Amino acid sequence: MKLRIYTLLIAFCAAWSLHSCDNDDDESIAVPTPLQEAFSTRYPNVKNVKWETKAGYYVADFYDGYEASAWFTTDGNWHMTETDIPYTALPDPVKSAFEASDYKTWKRDDVDKLERQGIETVYVIEVENQNQEVDLYYSADGVLIKSIADTDDHENEHLPTTQLPAVMKTFIDGKYAGARIVEVDVEDDKNDWDFGFTEVDIIHFDSGLNRNVSKEVLFDKGRE
């Protein structure tokens, strides 16, 4: 009788331990009150939120029609929201541009909507063909901003944009009047010749082509 009781007790403890481990995997980290309030203000209808930290940011993973993650700093400032959307939810100009591109026959793997502080919304279509994977970045009006080979390193694949210094913004406004900033990135590969440079992707009207085109402006410590 005692043996049976002990056996049941051990089985119960083992089951409880596994259940506790599962709960730990799903638990959200604690976040500062200003951060919680900032999230609730931006997404008032979202109830179930899981918080984690990535690359120095607090990241809220949630569902609001689609799976999404919102990136904040400790003080509650919003910097980016990445939303996993279906292809059908893309703006029509983006779908038209993709379907007229050289990648139209490639398999669509994933589609992301990137909303970031200080710059325009960007849509990323991930495509693959045999052993090749490419990320295509489009503006909402269907301009292809850039195409990047996917290295399968999905850790911090999309990050909040780097804050553009005022001197660079002034230069762009002066040389490319009416330009729309869609991407800001500081090159961080020490093996590249442009290490430490700031790369700014803009969309600017080309009068010769009579259409909007994507241009890359490269700065070295405030100079183009």
Where would I find each of the regions flagged by the language model?
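N-terminal hydrophobic alpha-helix used for membrane targeting or insertion
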Residues: 8-9, 129
